[in-house]
Amino acid sequence: MRSRMMQGIGRGLLLVLAALALAGCPSSQQEKSRGETLKQYETIVRWSQWDAAADFIAPEYLEEHPITRLQMDRLRLFRVTAYEVRSTGVFDEGMTVRQTVEIRLFNTHQAVERAIIDDQLWRYDVDLKRWLLYSGLPDPTQRH
């Protein structure tokens, strides 16, 4: 009798653990892709790889807001010392993400660090099956 009770408790515990494991997993490939994309972008920005970061920008956004040589040269003056996600919101049934990030930048020529806020807008492209950035690269000239 005692062993049956222990088996029942064991099964119940396994069911609870399985439910918790599933709750912690992304419910779709799109959600998994979102997490991977945001992490990849964060890593690229942390390493100050601005050309690679530009590859995340949506082509239609680039048509309206092309990245100038001056903007890229300006970004290359800086090394990222910190990248901290302040908030993330998911909208439009998971198709849009707004993320606010504080980025600390060290100016290699002036030996000065500054903090900027990067408001990112990400949208999932169903045809390409990937997340694209619709807000451009961080602006090291911003003042707040």
PLM segments and residue spans:
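Exposed beta-sheet edge and beta->alpha loop/turn motif
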Residues: 90-144
